[in-house]
């Protein structure tokens, strides 16, 4: 069964990430399904550089809760987060670990179905 996704947004566009942070939040109360595409061009550093990307949801755009969907990234490539369990606002939190980690060419795009 194919699904037509109605909205596409780019949250991060071909950037280098070396510290933990969050994408900007988006109001999504009218959407019922989300797919986040996380593309990483390269990974550098020592002690196993890791980027954990966690989908978060909020009822008020102030207090944030982890949703069940996350992905752990240790190498270049494509990764996907899917969810149909989120509130009015969403964002992606990314946590970076390792020694001198750099994740280059990072792009995060979300598609939602309304």
Report each predicted region and the residues it spans.
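Solvent-exposed serine/threonine-rich low-complexity stretches and specific carbohydrate-binding patches
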Residues: 10, 66-74
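Extended, low-complexity, turn-rich repeat/linker tracts enriched in Gly/Pro/Ser/Thr and Asp/Glu
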Residues: 41-50, 98-102
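Exposed aromatic-hydrophobic patches
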Residues: 23-26, 77-84
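Conserved Ser/Thr-centered positions that define the repeating blades of beta-propeller domains
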Residues: 56-58
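Surface-exposed coil/turn segments at beta-strand junctions on protein surfaces, enriched
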Residues: 29-31, 46, 74, 85
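C-terminal interaction-tip segments
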Residues: 1-14, 18-21, 30, 96-114
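Noncatalytic modules at the cell exterior or secretory-pathway interfaces
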Residues: 32-38, 84-101
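Short beta-strand/loop motifs in extracellular/secreted proteins, especially
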Residues: 32-34, 49-53, 102-104
């Amino acid at each position: 069964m194919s699904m037509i996704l109605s909205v596409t947004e780019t949250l991060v566009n071909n950037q280098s990430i070396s510290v933990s942070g969050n994408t900007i939040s988006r109001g999504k109360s009218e959407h019922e399904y989300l797919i986040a595409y996380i593309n990483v061009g390269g990974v550098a550093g020592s002690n196993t550089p890791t980027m954990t990307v966690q989908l978060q949801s909020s009822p008020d755009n102030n207090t944030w809760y982890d949703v069940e969907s996350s992905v752990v990234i240790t190498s270049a490539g494509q990764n996907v987060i899917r969810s149909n369990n989120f509130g009015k606002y969403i964002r992606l939190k990314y946590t970076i670990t390792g020694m001198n980690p750099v994740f280059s060419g990072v792009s995060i795009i979300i598609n939602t179905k309304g």
